[in-house]
Amino acid sequence: MARLAGVDIPREKRLEIALTYIYGVGKTRAHETLAATGISADVRVKDLTDAELVQLRDYIEGNYKVEGDLRREVAADIRRKVEIGSYEGLRHRKGLPVRGQRTKTNARTRKGPKRTVAGKKKAGR
């Protein structure tokens, strides 16, 4: 397995797909990276030379914030929003959707499993 940005990328996959295994690199950034380095997107990772791997590693680490640095930055942004008391920070704190989605129905991924609340008891006859 080849290592780029601290991630083992799969050897059998095409390079443009394998690069997306790095957190912070999607299809668009993978295409940009390959165009800038002049490496074909169709080549398999196992067929890359050491020089090409070094070239890819240098380009990605030099131009993009990826993996741990990006995760830390995102976490810091969320922490800052919570601390300043913004609406987004409040939604993060409560564990609710942040970007305006409805919560009357749906939003189960963010809210977690249903918690059943006891209903009102009927009066006995």
UniProtKB/Swiss-Prot annotation:
Q: Which Gene3D superfamilies match?
A: 1.10.8.50, 30s ribosomal protein s13, domain 2
Taxonomic superkingdom: Bacteria
Q: Which UniProt keywords apply?
A: Ribonucleoprotein, Ribosomal protein, RNA-binding, rRNA-binding, tRNA-binding
Q: Name one GO cellular component term.
A: cytosol
Please list where the region (Disordered) is annotated. Answer: 93-125
Query: Entry's InterPro entries?
Result: Rbsml_uS13_C (IPR027437), Ribosomal_uS13 (IPR001892), Ribosomal_uS13-like_H2TH (IPR010979), Ribosomal_uS13_bac-type (IPR019980), Ribosomal_uS13_CS (IPR018269)
Q: Which GO terms describe its biological process?
A: translation
Any GO MF annotation of the entry: tRNA binding
Function text: Located at the top of the head of the 30S subunit, it contacts several helices of the 16S rRNA. In the 70S ribosome it contacts the 23S rRNA (bridge B1a) and protein L5 of the 50S subunit (bridge B1b), connecting the 2 subunits; these bridges are implicated in subunit movement. Contacts the tRNAs in the A and P-sites.
Q: How does it assemble?
A: Part of the 30S ribosomal subunit. Forms a loose heterodimer with protein S19. Forms two bridges to the 50S subunit in the 70S ribosome.
- NCBIfam families, per database record: uS13_bact (TIGR03631)
Homology family: Belongs to the universal ribosomal protein uS13 family.
What name does the UniProt record give this protein?
Small ribosomal subunit protein uS13
Task: Identify the species of origin.
Answer: Paenarthrobacter aurescens (strain TC1)
